[in-house]
């Protein structure tokens, strides 16, 4: 009996291989008929999604690079604009400084001129006052020396001649 089992065993293994192979082929045919399109469509959709994601990432990278270039250009423009604003402010400050200095110089010149005019006026008034005082003193001295009073015209002639002598 045991020999019979041993002799039948090689046939069973061969039979098993044939049955399993047949089942596998049937399974492949069934998979091909019912599931192959679904499986390949899943793989195709996954491949398409990955491809779209890669394209989107590349587009985003390009957009980011463009945005960086734009921001750098704007920054350069802002720096240039700031430099222009500073230059304009410096120019305006220089012009204002020049105007203030010119105004101050004009005011100083005007004040100096007015002061000189005031000094000249005061000098003239002082001379007139001194002339009047000298005339009064001269008349008093002349009255005492002559012993008589002088009339207004004689007094004026005496003053003028005295002042003329002082002026020489």
Swiss-Prot record:
Family matches, as Gene3D superfamilies: F1F0 ATP synthase subunit B, membrane domain
InterPro entries per the UniProt record, alphabetical: ATP_synth_B-like_membr_sf, ATP_synth_b/b'su_bac/chlpt, ATP_synth_F0_bsu_bac, ATP_synthase_B_chain
Keyword annotations: ATP synthesis, Cell membrane, CF(0), Hydrogen ion transport, Ion transport, Membrane, Transmembrane, Transmembrane helix, Transport
CDD domains assigned to the protein according to its UniProt record, in alphabetical order: ATP-synt_Fo_b
Residue ranges of the TM segments: 11-31
Compartment(s): Cell membrane
SUPFAM superfamilies associated with the record: F1F0 ATP synthase subunit B, membrane domain
Bilayer topology: Single-pass membrane protein
A single GO molecular function term of this UniProt record: proton-transporting ATPase activity, rotational mechanism
Keyword Cell membrane: yes
Pfam families cross-referenced by the UniProt entry: ATP-synt_B
Listed GO CC annotations: plasma membrane; proton-transporting ATP synthase complex
Function summary: F(1)F(0) ATP synthase produces ATP from ADP in the presence of a proton or sodium gradient. F-type ATPases consist of two structural domains, F(1) containing the extramembraneous catalytic core and F(0) containing the membrane proton channel, linked together by a central stalk and a peripheral stalk. During catalysis, ATP synthesis in the catalytic domain of F(1) is coupled via a rotary mechanism of the central stalk subunits to proton translocation.
Family per similarity comment: Belongs to the ATPase B chain family.
HAMAP family in alphabetical order: ATP_synth_b_bprime
Quaternary structure note: F-type ATPases have 2 components, F(1) - the catalytic core - and F(0) - the membrane proton channel. F(1) has five subunits: alpha(3), beta(3), gamma(1), delta(1), epsilon(1). F(0) has three main subunits: a(1), b(2) and c(10-14). The alpha and beta chains form an alternating ring which encloses part of the gamma chain. F(1) is attached to F(0) by a central stalk formed by the gamma and epsilon chains, while a peripheral stalk is formed by the delta and b chains.
NCBIfam families: ATP_synt_b
Protein name as annotated: ATP synthase subunit b
Organism: Lactococcus lactis subsp. lactis (strain IL1403) (Streptococcus lactis)
